[in-house]
Amino acid sequence: MNRIVVIGSCNMDIVVLADKRPAAGETIMGNELHIAHGGKGANQAVAAARLGAEVTMVGCIGEDAYGQMIMDNLKENHINTDYIVTVPDTTTGTAHITLAEGDNSIIVIAGANAKVDQSVVDNAWSAIEQADLVMVQNEIPIPTIEYIVRRCHKANVKVLLNPAPAADLNPEWLELATYITPNEHELSALYPNQSTEETLL
């Protein structure tokens, strides 16, 4: 069984369906409310576990009900949560999504995801160094991603970086990642002076 460590975001998605978006100062009635598990990191962990991998999740949650919901969901999917840190006086990351008029508007609150730092990675290193693959995304601080990529490269641990959401990453350490999975928009952000064809070559 492949051992995968996912280092990344844990969110709850709060989705409101409405006929239109409210104007500034306006209150309107919505149609439906959905609360779902999210975060690119946690989503990757659940997907990998459901495909049969042995998965460990590394990240941060707040000391709140949403954090507990995330922990429960990960455990229900047989994911190791030993290296998820509960951060006092911090909210769990959330995405507030309005679906209206055929489109969506999203406000993301990083919350505890912003607390995923080098110490969180170091605490989980015993699991990371034994992994067949480490998966990372851009929903945690960029300096932490750089630290993960550099340290894993030095230890010959394979890293898959999903550079979403798009960000300006330093090519010097970006090239140390074993795999990068950008879409076309993210590829342009990573290599702004090259065409897609030039980058792939």
Question: Which residues make up each language-model segment?
Answer:
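Residues that scaffold the ATP/ADP-binding catalytic core of kinase and kinase-like folds
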Residues: V15, I107, A189-L190
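Glycine-rich phosphate/adenosyl-contacting loop at the front of the ribokinase-like
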Residues: M1-C60, A65-M69, K75-I79
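Glycine- and other small-residue-rich loops at beta-strand/loop junctions that grip anionic moieties
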Residues: G59, Q137-N138, N162
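Conserved phosphate-binding/catalytic loop of the ribokinase/pfkB sugar-kinase fold
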Residues: T86-V87, I97-L133, N138
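Short gly/ser/thr-rich secondary-structure transition/capping motifs
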Residues: H78, A114-S119, V159-P165
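Conserved phosphate/ATP/ADP-binding segment of small-molecule kinases
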Residues: V149-L201
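A glycine-rich helix N-cap at a beta->alpha junction
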Residues: N73-D89
